[in-house]
Amino acid sequence: SSSSAASDVYKRQVYLDGEAFFDVKKDNGRTFQVVTELVEVKVLGTRFDVRVSEEDNMAEVVLESGSVKLNERNKAEDGVILRPGEMGRVSRQSGIEVRHVDLQLYTTWKDKYMNIESQKMENVMFMLSKRYHTEIRIEGEELKAEIFSGRFDIDQSLENIFETIDLITPIHYQQQPDGTYLVTPK
């Protein structure tokens, strides 16, 4: 997985393929815009995450603070305004869908440390899969529902993080031939 961006500073416009977190300061008279293959995000002053997945043919925008307006690319309709804690998912098939999300699940990848507070293990694995750009499958309903708290230095290898989790919640992890990981209870 990779991200690439090109920008036009005069227009305050960024073209994005991948994922990026933005902390945008208000500039009277000039909006900030992120353009992807599927969505245009118009901003005044805010903090938000944009992830584009060509593989899944969709884009996600998660708003941490402020507000943003989402429009499907090359569509004339009014679009949708997101509020903090909301995610807008845009796909060619279903248009724009908005739902409330736990920000911790979508924005911790940008920090040096991943702070996890009282999250279900399936959410922990979701955050790790985003950070390490690999699929992590978890088996066992009890393990999925297990509540976990911890702090990881994101410069560690995924295997080291699995070993740390194992000290608190007994797990077994195995890398599969296709490069994905399977996590099961011990």
Would you name each region that the model predicts?
Residues 2-6:
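Positively charged, low-complexity/disordered segments
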Residues 7-186:
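A residue-level detector for the "anchor" residue at the start of short, highly conserved motifs
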